[in-house]
């Protein structure tokens, strides 16, 4: 069985209770990317977009690794600095087109099919249509995470998210086995014969389908990845058929995405039915109605970076992946079940009169929308926090410390073991500094997350400090000041009156003119003692 990528025609062109970050962020200004105005899918719900600017109130996906399982990617300025080491899982060297089979190079060498290839059946008897290279993976990746506010091109939905490119589609398709292996590796599962993935993905975007049931091996991969908290976002296919006929969209536990047009209705090509969870902008097969994203100028092999439009459920899925990356950047520990509860309860309704609105279940529960999702996150109940702790504690002293979250005892964790110890509900000061205890709790569908911190100041012991000088000091005479202290810090002796006296590099004091010589000795703070300084005066005479 051969997997088919969704390849439409592309057109060139103290106690601190930290609130949920979703509860306080402001709506950002539009980005300065020159093609942003042409990205209709990023506009507000009023024009059937995802509302990018409201999505960015969550953040822009920083730290949330997004794997794109696709044709690989080409070098593009919109990805600079955020491409992680990926992998090429195409086992068929001929189909891979890069000289070998599986390897650590996930770049896209092009997937064109020529007349000669068809005549010679280079890629098998089922490959019967000529095509230029699709640059499909590059386009999908750009929708998710193209850089924003860099003054060029387009803006991605999660422009700070790291990109994990994983190549599974070559000339005229790919294999289900390669796809399953790629899914497992991308999410951090072990795979014999393949190096361990050092940067597992939190979100896996799969913009490809194969017409078949979800195999036991594929379902097992989805189950294991879901258990690790990996979100698998899949396109539902472009055949205008029941989506339940296509894997991996028919695997239980994937988030399946159908396509809508600028009018907010089901795109004519989009698969449909009960296997569709939600919809997102996928565009119509026209330049003005398509999805504008990153592309490449080459018709066969890659040449220069470019931008182009495409349409398909392949283009819809990455809008959902980008929104989820933004959400999980704000709340990485949010249980995925709560994430989906909030997501499905806050989809934008399909426009009145559309086929999706008239036939419930045809296109999923609604259109994914960042504004509605953000509002739901921000409206969650803030937890009630209480605490009992001293504000200051002397070295060697102990005191009870406790905290509650919504009336239940909070499990406090010590984060500064060199400053204090914590056991049995009591903290003991060890050294000067800030003693910090912390309690965290993930958010849920109804309650904001907790990040409670208790800070106790531990001052150092006040050291004794004296500086012995003679009553008078003759001009040009040199003496060594005598410093006495109980501190284990190293004292520094300096002159406060350099026109009257100076302290040399060897620590000796010398009077250079008549007058009052002021000498300062300073001690730094140490683990046991506080900082201290004193100034002593001596009369310099001739």
Residue ranges with predicted function:
Residues 8-19:
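Bacterial N-terminal signal peptides
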Residues 20-24:
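Sec/Tat signal peptide C-region and signal peptidase I cleavage site
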Residues 26-162, 171-174, 178-185, 189-200, ...:
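Active-site core segment of subtilase-fold serine proteases
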Residues 65-69, 85-88, 139-143, 155-156, ...:
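Structural recognition of the beta-strand scaffold that forms the well-ordered cores
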Residues 71-75, 79, 148-150, 169-172, ...:
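Acidic glycine-/aspartate-rich tracts in secreted/extracellular proteins
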Residues 92, 230, 246-329, 333, ...:
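Extracellular S/T/G-rich loop segment that most often corresponds to the catalytic His/Ser-adjacent loop
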Residues 184-188, 193-208, 214-221, 228-230, ...:
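C-terminal subdomain of the subtilisin-like protease fold in secreted/lumenal serine endopeptidases
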Residues 379-542:
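Solvent-exposed beta-strand/loop surfaces, strongest in extracytoplasmic domains of secreted
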């Amino acid at each position: 069985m051969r997997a088919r990528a969704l390849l439409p025609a592309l057109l060139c062109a103290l106690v601190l209770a930290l609130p949920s970050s979703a509860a306080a962020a402001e709506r950002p200004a539009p980005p300065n990317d020159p093609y942003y105005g042409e990205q209709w899918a990023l506009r507000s719900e009023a024009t059937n977009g995802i509302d990018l600017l409201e999505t960015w109130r969550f953040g822009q996906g920083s730290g949330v690794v997004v794997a794109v399982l696709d044709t690989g990617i080409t070098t593009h300025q919109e990805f600079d600095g955020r491409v992680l080491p990926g992998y090429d899982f195409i086992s068929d060297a001929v189909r891979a087109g890069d000289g070998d089979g599986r390897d650590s190079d996930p770049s896209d060498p092009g997937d064109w099919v020529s007349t000669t290839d068809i005549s010679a059946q280079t890629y098998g008897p089922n490959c019967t249509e000529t095509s230029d290279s699709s640059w499909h993976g590059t386009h999908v990746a750009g929708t998710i995470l193209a850089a924003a506010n860099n003054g060029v091109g387009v803006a991605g939905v999660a422009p700070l998210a790291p990109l994990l490119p994983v190549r599974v589609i070559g000339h005229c398709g790919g294999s289900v086995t390669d796809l399953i292996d790629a899914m497992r590796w991308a999410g951090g599962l072990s795979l014999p014969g393949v190096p361990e993935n050092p940067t597992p993905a939190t979100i896996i975007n799969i913009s490809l389908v194969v017409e078949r049931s979800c195999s036991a091996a594929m379902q097992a991969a989805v189950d294991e990845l879901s258990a690790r908290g990996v979100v698998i976002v899949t396109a539902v296919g472009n055949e205008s058929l029941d989506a339940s006929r296509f894997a991996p969209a028919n695997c239980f536990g994937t988030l399946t995405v159908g396509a809508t047009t600028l009018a907010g209705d089901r795109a004519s090509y989009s698969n449909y039915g009960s296997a569709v969870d939600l919809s997102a902008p996928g565009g119509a097969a026209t330049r003005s109605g398509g999805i504008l994203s990153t592309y490449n100028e080459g018709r066969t092999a890659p040449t220069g970076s470019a931008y182009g439009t495409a349409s398909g459920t392949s283009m819809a899925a990455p809008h959902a992946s980008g929104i989820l990356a933004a959400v999980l950047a704000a709340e990485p520990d949010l249980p995925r079940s709560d994430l989906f509860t909030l997501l499905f309860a806050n989809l934008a309704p399909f426009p009145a009169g559309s086929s999706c609105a008239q036939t419930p279940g045809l296109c999923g529960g609604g259109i994914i929308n960042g504004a509605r999702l953000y509002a739901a996150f921000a409206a969650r109940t803030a937890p009630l926090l209480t605490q009992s702790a001293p504000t200051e504690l002397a070295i060697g002293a102990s005191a009870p410390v406790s905290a509650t979250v919504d009336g239940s005892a909070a499990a406090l964790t010590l984060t500064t073991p060199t400053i204090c110890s914590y056991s049995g509900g009591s903290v003991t000061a060890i050294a000067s500094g800030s003693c910090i205890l912390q309690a965290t709790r993930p958010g849920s569908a109804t309650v904001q997350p907790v990040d409670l911190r208790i800070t106790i100041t531990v001052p150092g012991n006040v050291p004794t400090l004296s500086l012995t000088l003679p009553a008078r000091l003759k001009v040009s005479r040199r003496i060594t000041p005598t410093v006495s202290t109980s501190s284990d810090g190293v004292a520094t002796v300096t002159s406060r009156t350099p026109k009257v006296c100076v302290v040399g590099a060897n620590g000796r004091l010398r009077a250079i003119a008549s007058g009052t010589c002021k000498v300062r000795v300073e001690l730094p703070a140490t683990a046991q003692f506080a900082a201290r300084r004193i100034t002593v005066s001596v009369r310099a005479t001739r």
